[in-house]
Swiss-Prot record:
It is found in: Cytoplasm. PANTHER family: ARGININE--TRNA LIGASE, CYTOPLASMIC (PTHR11956:SF5), ARGINYL-TRNA SYNTHETASE (PTHR11956). The lineage of its organism: Bacteria, Pseudomonadati, Pseudomonadota, Gammaproteobacteria, Legionellales. It comes from the Bacteria. The gene is argS. Keywords: Aminoacyl-tRNA synthetase, ATP-binding, Cytoplasm, Ligase, Nucleotide-binding, Protein biosynthesis. It comes from Coxiella burnetii (strain CbuG_Q212) (Coxiella burnetii (strain Q212)). This is Arginine--tRNA ligase. The keyword Nucleotide-binding applies. A motif ('HIGH' region) lies at residues 134-144. NCBIfam families: argS. InterPro entries: aa-tRNA-synth_I_CS (IPR001412), Arg-tRNA-ligase (IPR001278), Arg-tRNA-synth_N (IPR005148), Arg-tRNA-synth_N_sf (IPR036695), ArgRS_core (IPR035684), DALR_anticod-bd (IPR008909), Rossmann-like_a/b/a_fold (IPR014729), tRNAsynth_Ia_anticodon-bd (IPR009080). GO terms for molecular function: arginine-tRNA ligase activity; ATP binding. GO terms for cellular component: cytoplasm.
Length: 592
């Protein structure tokens, strides 16, 4: 595969050979080991590639950067792909490559097709990725959508770079919030029989709770019914619902468990969990986000993984008892305070579950483990790295990526969200309003740790201001050229076009060729830096260059040789746009 990174490697080889020659001549000492950095220039007048090698080695050589640059250039071996080498400024070395070097990029793209840009950079390396993992207590909201789009794109990029990626969703099916969910459904169920019963203000309020309750009533009738009086009798009188609403809520959960008993409580609990989890799965699948595994927290208890983690931390001396609870000595490993692992009632904390889950991940032998969290989890990072050290695991294998929640604007008005309050805008509602493509692209077009103001009106607009529309329109325009071709007496001879790529000599064409050649390098950089926004920006640049070219030139011309060369070029642009959009989870429509 020919691309600009290949050309950079070839230039680096030439520079290494020049350095070795200078060592032989005594200009540089034998122990000098240069780090050769080559960049692609933005101004064609300064060539195609540049290096600051002379500036970095001037001190070791005992001469000015410009003087050393002259000696490096003199020592460069000849190359059939380099037409000119010049020294600029204080000692930068600029390289001009042959036009043929760029033109071979077109043939490489058309030959590789959908595989152009893929590499074996990560061959043999296994990566575990966990993302979204929202509590199954309600539908996904627009905040979760950004983590979903980002995680899916990073997984796609790593896969394109040759890594074997395992995608996982951690299902928190064993925590306090799940008890509150089951309670919320049960009270809505009871309201079908007694209107006087009130839902505690901190319970889940959304309409989806009523839907689950009605389904429960339709299937089981009055099996779970208990009177208001019997419930109130279970609530301690000293608990004030206004003074301590959370304690009041916990008392309700305890009352529910006592009155229903284990079997019926599990039935209500499972109905709520299954309904919401199925909705989450369907929502994500419709959004193009799929997983290899949905890992339930309850499995950690069932398979003894929490106890395994506790035993390992104890073995390494990081567990102690205080006030009837078992604590992790987190401060000894860089955290701000020690953390409770097992409460005095014998129940594990969320923290204990996280220890067990990460121990399980590390025990699978992955080369990289990636956790994608909301930015509000930033304080959790030292905690996780601390317990990994306590477990005797290598913290450097873990990469925690933080994603800022997207802020949705309807007009100039900010939309607030609260899962328990039921006032949130769901991911499904967003997708239905702006479409999957706009949602996927808008979510990832900024760095993940930057705040994202999601402009609904812009996302729906069919204008050049809408970046995803602009990119898709470039693809559709190219498709229209080939449809128009079929209505004429002209033909497209791809082999003949390959033979005449040298005719692609306008500045528009040279610019497009150079940008096409950058695509494989963009994929590698985006994968290694977990940065899909780099690919989004690249596609915007490519689309802009194509639209400029489209407006300036004609393609279905009488000159057979030039026509075929240009059709090959725009076919290559079409392929790269389609490849890039696919990695971002965005469609490439043929008509718009």
């Amino acid at each position: 595969m020919i691309d600009l990174s290949t050309m950079k490697q070839q230039i680096a080889t030439l520079l290494n050979q020049a350095i070795e020659r200078l060592k032989t001549k005594g200009v540089l000492k034998p122990e000098v080991t240069p780090v050769i950095k080559i960049t692609h220039t933005t101004d064609p007048q300064h060539g195609d590639f540049a290096t600051n090698l002379a500036l970095t080695l001037s001190k070791a050589a005992g001469m000015s950067p410009h003087a050393l640059a002259e000696k490096i250039v003199e020592a460069l071996p000849p190359s059939g792909q380099i037409t000119e080498v010049e020294i600029a400024g204080p000692g930068f070395i600029n390289f001009f490559v042959t036009e043929g070097s760029y033109q071979t990029i077109v043939s490489s793209i058309l030959k590789a097709g959908k595989d152009y840009g893929r590499s074996e950079m990560g061959k043999g390396q296994r990566v575990h990725m966990e993302y979204v993992s929202a509590n199954p207590t309600g539908p996904l909201h627009v905040g979760h959508g950004r983590g979903a789009a980002y995680g899916a794109c990073v997984a796609n990029l790593l896969n394109a770079a040759g890594f074997e990626v395992h995608r996982e969703y951690y299902v928190n099916d064993a925590g306090r919030q799940m008890g509150i969910l089951a309670l919320s459904v049960w009270i809505r169920y009871l309201q079908g029989y007694e209107a006087s019963i009130e839902l505690p203000k901190n319970a889940y309020q959304g309409e989806y709770i009523i839907d689950i309750a009605e389904a429960l009533k339709a299937k089981y009738g009055k099996q779970f019914y208990h009177s208001v009086e019997s419930i109130q009798a279970k609530i301690p009188e000293e608990i004030d619902s206004n003074a301590d609403p959370e304690a009041y809520l916990d008392a309700w959960v305890t009352a529910q468990k006592d009155l229903l008993g284990p079997k019926d409580f599990e039935c209500v609990f499972q109905a709520a969990l299954d309904s919401i989890l199925n909705d989450i799965k369907n929502d994500l699948e419709e959004f193009g986000v799929t997983y290899d595994d949905w890992f339930p927290e309850s499995r950690l208890v069932r398979e003894g993984l929490i106890q395994e983690g506790l035993d390992l931390l104890t073995k390494h001396g990081y567990v102690y008892e205080k006030n009837g609870a078992q604590w992790f000595r987190a401060t000894a490993l860089g955290d701000e305070k020690d953390r409770v692992l097992i409460r005095k009632n014998g129940l594990p904390t969320y923290f204990a579950a996280d220890v067990a889950y990460h121990l399980h991940k590390f025990n699978q032998g992955y080369d990289q483990i990636i956790d994608i969290f909301g930015a509000d989890h930033h304080g959790y990072i030292p905690r996780i790295r601390g317990f990994l050290k306590g477990l005797g695991k290598a913290p450097e294998k873990l990469h925690i990526l933080l994603v800022q929640f997207a802020i949705l604007y309807r007009g100039n008005e900010k939309v607030s969200m609260s899962t328990r309050g039921g006032t949130f805008v769901t991911l499904r509602e967003l997708r239905h309003e702006v479409g999957n493509d706009a949602a996927r692209f808008f979510y990832i077009m900024r760095k993940p740790d930057q705040h994202l103001d999601f402009d609904l009106e812009l996302a729906k607009s069919q204008s050049n201001e809408n970046p995803v529309y602009y990119i898709q329109y470039a693809h559709a325009r190219i498709c229209s050229v080939f449809r128009q071709l079929k209505t004429t007496q002209k033909n497209w001879d791809r082999p003949r076009g390959m033979e005449n790529l040298s005719l692609l000599s306008t500045n528009y064409e040279k610019e497009l060729l150079a940008t096409l050649g950058r695509y494989p390098e963009v994929i590698k950089r985006a994968a290694m830096n977990y940065a899909p926004h780099l690919l989004a920006h690249y596609l915007q640049t490519l689309a802009n260059q194509f639209h400029t070219y489209y407006n300036a030139e004609r393609f279905l011309i009488e000159d057979d040789n030039l026509r075929n060369a240009r059709l090959n070029l725009i076919n290559a642009v079409q392929q790269i746009i389609r490849n890039g959009l696919t990695l971002l989870g965005v469609s490439a429509p043929e008509e718009m």
